[in-house]
Amino acid sequence: MQSMPDSTRHPPLSYCKAGVDIEKAADLVEAIKPIAKRTRRPGVLSGIGGFGGLFELPRGYKQPVLVSGTDGVGTKLKLAVELNRHDTIGIDLVAMCVNDVITTGAEPLFFLDYYATGHLNNEQAKQILTGIGAGCELAEVALIGGETAEMPGLYRQKDYDLAGFCVGVVEKEKIIDGSRVRVGDALIGIASSGPHSNGYSLIRKILARAKIPLSQSFENKSLADGLLAPTRIYVKTIKRLFSEINVHALAHITGGGLIENVPRVLPSYTQAVIDSNGWEWPAIFHWLQKQGKVPIEEMWRTFNMGVGMVLCLDKKEVRKTLELLAALGETAWILGEIQSSSEEQPRVTITP
């Protein structure tokens, strides 16, 4: 009969020795509480640390519709890890979620985060969560909860992943879903801060192939600064527009660029005709195209090309909209217009 291994020869095990430090995680929760408190807004009914975050819907809605969104930051995280700079990646996370939610006409209300890592480094985590808090303040949403998962063996020690979750509310009759878009409508683009949080797998490939150090000077700052510039949060600007402009559709320009994202909010048998000479690409996109020898079609399909949000509205409102955006400190351009198409599937046509 086979004997069982003698476990007495080994020291006793614990969760901590297995790689999960519960006390360190508890310390992090305490560090998060003042960050969350700074984001508090009317409607918050609970603090951080409970089993669920409680939020009361604002009064005054006749038929409130909840709008949810979830997203991550993609491989931009790899640059943050390589550079050991984690202070703005949380802003990216919030931006990717709230910018999606507001395209429906909804006001983003609250946010939750998920932070997973192979080894919990509280200093790193505090930087990330401080950024998330800053993003929530910029978006005027409350940070009401989240999850920290230490998973040794699944992630390498320094690696981590982030996911964000946002919920907003919109009056049912004010939902923006593209159904109001008409042929002849104008398209206005609002400037991005750079690649935002998309295209970084290609960016990292370009950097690796060209053997270019991230410390290299670029546009009066380091290349690292340019590539880690946080994603713009458009919530305050768009909420102001909603109060004064009849916006027919909104497209958040993320992975897939203008080519893939604008058609998501267009009705059948229409196309967005965009004049590529309507704005100047930020220098970072010229640089990436040159260093990677990236075909122009691939650039359009991968990057935002300097446009972070696209508005579709009646041509009669263009001047007022541009003036309002300028007053709000935004850089914006007329990108083109909506035209009819013989194809049922909406599309984008970029004119040279």
UniProtKB/Swiss-Prot annotation:
InterPro entries reported in the protein's UniProt record: PurM-like_C_dom, PurM-like_C_sf, PurM-like_N, PurM-like_N_sf, PurM_cligase
Keyword annotations from UniProtKB, A to Z: ATP-binding, Cytoplasm, Ligase, Nucleotide-binding, Purine biosynthesis
Pathway(s) of this molecule: Purine metabolism; IMP biosynthesis via de novo pathway; 5-amino-1-(5-phospho-D-ribosyl)imidazole from N(2)-formyl-N(1)-(5-phospho-D-ribosyl)glycinamide: step 2/2
Membrane spanning residue stretches: none
Subcellular location as annotated: Cytoplasm
Swiss-Prot/TrEMBL catalytic activity: 2-formamido-N(1)-(5-O-phospho-beta-D-ribosyl)acetamidine + ATP = 5-amino-1-(5-phospho-beta-D-ribosyl)imidazole + ADP + phosphate + H(+)
GO cellular component: cytosol
Entry's Gene Ontology molecular function annotations: ATP binding; phosphoribosylamine-glycine ligase activity; phosphoribosylformylglycinamidine cyclo-ligase activity
Keyword Nucleotide-binding: yes
Pfam families assigned to the protein according to its UniProt record, in alphabetical order: AIRS, AIRS_C
First-listed, main subcellular location of the protein, grouped into a coarse class: cytoplasm
Protein family (similarity comment): Belongs to the AIR synthase family.
Record-given protein name: Phosphoribosylformylglycinamidine cyclo-ligase
